[in-house]
Amino acid sequence: MIVSAQCDLRYATLEELEVQSAAAAVDWLSTDELDLWRKFRSDVRRDTFLAGRILAKRLLRAQHCTAALARPSQITIRSDASSSGVRPRIMLDGHRLAYSLSISHTCDAVLVGGTNRFGVSLGVDLVRMRTLGAAFERSWLTETESAFLRQNEDDMTVADIWAMKEAVFKAVHRGESFAPRSVEILLEPEGTTVHYHGRNLRDRCRLRVWRLGGEVAAVATYQRLGARPRPHNNKRSVSSAILTP
């Protein structure tokens, strides 16, 4: 486990989570989740959905004292299938748990992050390393980000910035839809500055990006309270890391 930016993270491959086991879905999914899982036509969609729930509930039961006493199938994680800016909601016995959760996956692995710190929301994103064309870069990156990318091609890729933007949006949004260019990541030697719809988030937003084999992982946390966290050094980090499932 790595504790980073006021949150706990878990990473695992689908193989490690044994999502193909006949009993896994029944053991880990609530009735509502099981109904939704059975409606998915794609095997990949079923496997990634199940993997995300398994890993998220492992993290939740380790962090939240109420959830620790519950069976995994008693916990329901509700999210918006259209990805239109609705955070996952965690329900137990009809009550919503006070916990900020974020789930992201590729076809092969899943990353989850969570925190029970009051006033802190977070977002995680997991992206496969691959070449992305000029059209994608134009639609996702601002001119400043593209210029930085050209100057730092050995250390940074479009996939890194993609993952960071997704993570920031998940942490910061208030229900609006995702617009990639509304999030601007300014990476400088003295630290990272994040703008959201032109607003400088300053020290309220903490951001980290690193590599996990052939994937890019990013986590962002956002302080929503009036009181700001203590000053910190928000330096960019692109490095390998190991997270336990």
Model-derived features: where do they sit?
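Core catalytic alpha/beta fold that binds nucleotide/phospho-ligands
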Residues: 1-245
